[in-house]
């Protein structure tokens, strides 16, 4: 492949990543809205923000649906960061 072809391919891939990043952000914001609603329900019902069993179930489910190429450890790490970050919206 020539440098020009590689450059075009690189540009296309970067453009695709930009689009995916926008989609991810949209989905994360949708998830955040759900988290806020859950937080309001938990406050009303005087429940704890952190529910370790629910988090474990969520992460276990992600392990079963992960088809790669990310390893389960990578996916779990990313989702743990998302969970921990969005928990603040429930407070």
Place the predicted regions along the sequence by residue.
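Domain-level signature for soluble enzymes in the chorismate/prephenate branch of the shikimate pathway
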Residues: 1-91
């Amino acid at each position: 492949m020539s440098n020009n072809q590689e450059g075009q391919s690189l540009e296309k891939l970067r453009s695709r990543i930009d689009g995916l990043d926008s989609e991810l952000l949209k989905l994360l914001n949708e998830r955040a809205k759900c988290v806020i609603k859950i937080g309001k329900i938990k406050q009303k019902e005087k429940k704890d923000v952190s529910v370790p069993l629910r988090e474990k179930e969520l992460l276990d489910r992600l392990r079963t649906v992960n088809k790669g190429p990310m390893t389960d450890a990578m996916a779990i790490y990313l989702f743990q960061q998302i969970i921990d970050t969005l928990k603040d919206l429930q407070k």
